[in-house]
A protein has these predicted regions:
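Extracytoplasmic beta-strand/coil segments of soluble accessory domains associated
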Residues: 53-94, 123
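Outer-membrane beta-barrel transmembrane strands
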Residues: 81, 259-302, 376-414, 419-420, ...
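Transmembrane beta-barrel wall of Gram-negative outer-membrane proteins
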Residues: 157-190, 194-233, 265, 271-281
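Short acidic/polar hinge/loop motifs at secondary-structure boundaries
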Residues: 55, 64, 93-124, 141-143, ...
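Acidic/polar loop-and-plug regions of large Gram-negative outer-membrane beta-barrel proteins
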Residues: 218-276, 299-382, 445-460
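Outer-membrane beta-barrel transmembrane domain signature of Gram-negative proteins
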Residues: 148-171, 413-475
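Hydrophobic, lipid-facing positions within transmembrane beta-strands of outer-membrane proteins
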Residues: 74, 134-136, 164-168, 203-207, ...
Length: 475
């Protein structure tokens, strides 16, 4: 992640045909656009899985509009480009992640109605908010006066990451006193999704207010967020899928005191806000200025263990039958003991679900034994954070010279601070953990400085909630 400071000045002319049809096409988009977020956009960690269908379905191009609506569940990509080649703006301010180059759709998850007003463009198309990147761009309009007056309640169910979703949106429209207010709430939930061991718990909110002072000036403010907690599924090997007799096998969870517990849990919350000033200087000249803020808090948990502890992952290669001997190698002749062990491990994998999943109780027992001997905690659960603090500013001046010519001048300033660290989430019943590289200890011993994660605070004792391992900022 790095700080990006960009100043963009764009001067271009609109052809008579584009200019004459601009207003009509904008109205057609608002009336007929079908804007669809895929499940991958709202829920996946891997931003590379995000598709471009979010913007193409709001585009007035016949081809893009149709494929965006019809193929969005299939993660349609314009010309095969990944999502880092597409830009997403809110009130004219770029909100793409500086590190990945992609827009985080999780920040507006569950806010379908609040993000319905938008303008989409294809590659290098003429527009009033940005250069057209090769993957296209979308500008979401969150000004309160742009929402139709009224209320809407929707309930839906599915059998994917979550099973129930509720959304409520209310808008006053533009009142006689020049004020407009819009609010939206959403909730998505699943005790367990279609993948065993996963769960979903997400709340979302949106609040917007706007004051129209007169025909020339208006000020608007909007804030939104979607705090989310969800259990992840994990990829495994074809051998594990075969033994589990399911390609939905998920090695990330296990039983703890008879209850399912997922080791890979995502906690994400990206509270954001944007303020906009619209100044219609006259009929020919317009100035739109916006300033945005985003604080991204994203953490994903994972199991950790010392170099002297057995690997707790159930699908670790040494726990699979293939580690005993290679059944596909005809030159391999197993001994009777190897064959018996192979059959025994295969049978356990096929018949015992506990064999295929994480053994939480065993990890707690191992740590309790280490406590009794005054030794280091063997197993723990860490949370890896990739947080951001971002400020964005945009000012766009549009001048229509005559019926055939116009130009746009824009200024954009973006700055981001990235905060990367991990913290101790759960010691799993352990008492003692020292901030050193446990695998380096095996090679260099406890007396070597090489094992220290923090040379300024050597051998620092770590408790739950403390940062350890690494902690750095990138500006």
């Amino acid at each position: 992640m790095k700080q990006r400071l960009g100043i963009v000045i764009a001067l271009f002319c609109l052809s008579p045909a584009i200019f004459a049809q601009q207003k009509a096409e904008k109205n057609a988009r608002e009336d007929n656009a079908s804007f669809t977020f895929t499940e991958s956009q709202l829920n996946e960690d891997d931003d590379a899985a995000q598709s471009a269908s979010a913007f193409v379905s709001s585009n007035n191009d016949v081809y893009l509009s149709n494929v965006g609506y019809l193929f969005s569940p299939m993660r349609f990509r314009v010309r095969g480009y990944n999502s880092q080649y597409s830009d997403t703006y809110i009130n004219g301010v770029l909100f793409n992640d500086v590190e990945t180059g992609r827009f985080s759709y999780g920040m507006i998850g569950g806010l379908n109605d609040a993000t319905r007003n938008k303008e989409g463009i294809g590659a290098f198309e003429v527009n009033n908010f940005t250069f057209g990147p090769i993957g296209g761009a979308t500008n979401i309009n969150m000004r309160a006066s742009q929402y139709a007056a009224g209320s809407k309640l929707s309930l839906s169910g599915c059998n994917r990451n979550y099973i129930l979703r509720g959304m409520y949106t209310y808008s006053t429209g533009l009142l006689k006193n020049g004020w407009a207010f819009t609010g939206s709430l959403g909730y998505r939930w699943a005790n367990e999704g279609v993948i065993e061991g996963t769960f979903y718990n997400a709340f979302s909110y949106f609040l917007a207010a706007e004051k129209v002072f007169n025909d020339k000036h208006s000020l608007s403010f909007a804030t939104w967020g979607a705090p989310t907690e969800r259990g992840q599924q994990g990829a495994s090997t074809e051998e594990a899928y075969y033994l589990a007799n399911s390609h939905y096998y998920n090695p990330n969870w296990g039983y703890q005191n008879g209850e399912k517990r997922n080791s890979r849990v995502v906690h994400s919350f990206e509270p954001s806000a944007i303020a906009s000033w619209d100044f219609d200087i006259n009929k020919e000249m317009k100035l739109k200025t916006s300033a945005g803020f985003k604080y991204s808090n994203y953490g994903t948990s994972a199991l950790g263990w010392s170099g002297n502890a057995a690997d707790p992952r159930p699908d670790y290669y040494k726990k699979l039958p293939s580690s005993i001997f290679n059944v596909y190698d005809k030159s391999t002749v197993p001994s009777e003991d190897e064959l018996n062990l192979f059959n025994e491990v295969t049978e356990r994998w096929k018949t015992s679900k506990s064999t295929r999943q994480i053994d939480w109780d065993q990890m707690y027992f191992a740590n309790q034994q280490a406590n009794a001997l005054g030794k280091e905690t063997l197993y723990y659960q860490e949370e890896r954070h990739n947080d951001q603090l971002a400020f964005n500013f945009s000012s766009i001046f549009n001048h229509t010279i005559d019926q055939h010519n116009s130009y746009v001048v824009g200024l954009a300033v973006n700055t981001t601070k990235g905060m990367h660290y991990k913290k101790m989430k759960d010691l799993l019943g352990g008492d003692l953990y020292t901030d050193v590289d446990k695998f380096s200890v095996r090679d260099y011993g406890y007396n070597s400085y090489v094992i220290q994660n923090d040379l300024d605070n050597p051998n620092r004792r770590i408790g739950e909630g403390d940062k350890f391992g690494y902690d750095y900022n990138i500006f």
